[in-house]
A protein has these predicted regions:
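Residues at or immediately preceding the N-termini of alpha-helices
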Residues: 25, 103-104
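Short beta-strand/loop segment at the start of cytosolic alpha/beta domains
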Residues: 1-15
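Amphipathic alpha-helical interaction surfaces in cytosolic regulatory modules
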Residues: 22-96
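Acidic phosphotransfer microenvironment of two-component signaling modules
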Residues: 82, 104-105
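Short acidic-hydrophobic, aromatic-tinged amphipathic segments that line or gate anion-handling sites
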Residues: 98-102
Length: 110
């Protein structure tokens, strides 16, 4: 899995590519934690190129959201494909996170 990071309008945009599972979740967690500890508190996670997410990947998102809640931050998600979108629907994550169809839509009004 690869994660690219860019900043758009003071929002850290993380684009995930590949699979977010048991093997790759620790790296994703470390990257998010490092950014949060550096003072970042607004994140957009773009899953356009994410092929698969496991329960370990979902836990990474929950942990980051919990950290951000304590510092008045926010984590938004965009560009879910059909497979990842189904996991979000079944797990109820679409009610936990703000999910947007595109990156530009998610950044609007952040």
């Amino acid at each position: 899995m690869q994660i690219s990071v860019k900043t758009t309008n003071e929002v850290k945009v993380l684009a995930f590519e590949g699979k977010l599972d048991t093997g790759t979740s620790p790296n994703a967690q470390q990257q998010l934690t490092r950014l949060i500890e550096a003072g970042e508190n607004r994140f957009l996670v773009n899953f356009e190129k994410l092929d698969y997410i496991s329960s370990s990947g979902l836990r990474v998102l929950l942990a980051a959201a919990k950290q951000l809640k304590g510092i008045d931050g926010e984590l938004r998600i965009c560009s879910l494909n059909e497979v990842v979108g189904e996991v979000f629907d079944i797990s109820g994550f679409t009610t936990i996170f703000k999910v947007f169809g595109s990156e530009s839509e998610a950044l609007d009004g952040f």
